[in-house]
Amino acid sequence: MDIVNIAWAALMVVSTFSLTLVVWGRSGL
């Protein structure tokens, strides 16, 4: 893997994690 693929993978993980936290926060969990 090169640095670009690693950066994209990290970005997707962080984005998904952030969206999950927002959804959980709004649903009251």
Swiss-Prot record:
Keywords: Chloroplast, Electron transport, Membrane, Photosynthesis, Plastid, Thylakoid, Transmembrane, Transmembrane helix, Transport
Membrane topology of the entry: Single-pass membrane protein
Lineage top rank: taxon: Eukaryota
Keyword Chaperone listed: no
Single GO term (MF): electron transporter, transferring electrons within cytochrome b6/f complex of photosystem II activity
Family of the protein in this entry: Belongs to the PetN family.
Assembly, per entry: The 4 large subunits of the cytochrome b6-f complex are cytochrome b6, subunit IV (17 kDa polypeptide, PetD), cytochrome f and the Rieske protein, while the 4 small subunits are PetG, PetL, PetM and PetN. The complex functions as a dimer.
Name listed for the protein in its UniProt record: Cytochrome b6-f complex subunit 8
Organism this protein belongs to: Huperzia lucidula (Shining clubmoss)
Gene that encodes it: petN
